[in-house]
Amino acid sequence: IMYNGYATISLGYAGLYETVQALIHQSHTTDDGRELALQIMNKLNAYCEKWKKETNLAFSVYGTPMESGTYKFAKALQRDFDVVPEVNEHDYITNSYHVNVREEIDAFDKLSKESEFQELSSGGSISYIEIPNMEKNIPALLEVIKFIYDNNMYAECNTRNDVCDTCGFHGEMEMVKQEDGTYVWRCPNCGETNINKLEIVRRVCGYLGRISNGVNQGRLGDIHDRVFHL
């Protein structure tokens, strides 16, 4: 059952943004950065084709979400190479081919640029955009959805709609960086910081779900740094 394409072995990758930064000190959203990033992706796909011919097993390139690994890998890079700006200065690695979470870019440009890399990630991929509450601007949200339909294999919208069980506040919870560098969630209305009393929904590992104490500090840093694309 493993042979002739009935099963797939995934070659997962992450940190395409950091790799391009390390090599040419540019984001892969620039012309030169994009060209290098596509060369890297094509090389990964070429290896998958080579292994497929050699083994008769189906190999494919997979855009890895890298949830727990994002913190572990970032710390390992800091340990082995010291801190390099825009490469390992943060406690997380950018997922797969994604535009870095800190980069200011509009939704349509982000989705368009990432669509090229989705085509080279046949083992699985997902793009996302960060959006504010769109309840009062549904037409704009529909335009984004239409664009995704026409340009992307798989993409989703992340919004922020949290609830404080202590005071009943309904909106976006704050993420506060403490003196020791760790992050905690806080209700902007009453100051509640007990995560068990805050219903916070964010995308982690490709799915929208309630944030709990199980989310590592690296991923929390990623969430903290995410910018809106609309």
Model-predicted segments: where are they?
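Long, C-terminal-biased catalytic regions of enzyme "large/alpha" subunits
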Residues: 1-230
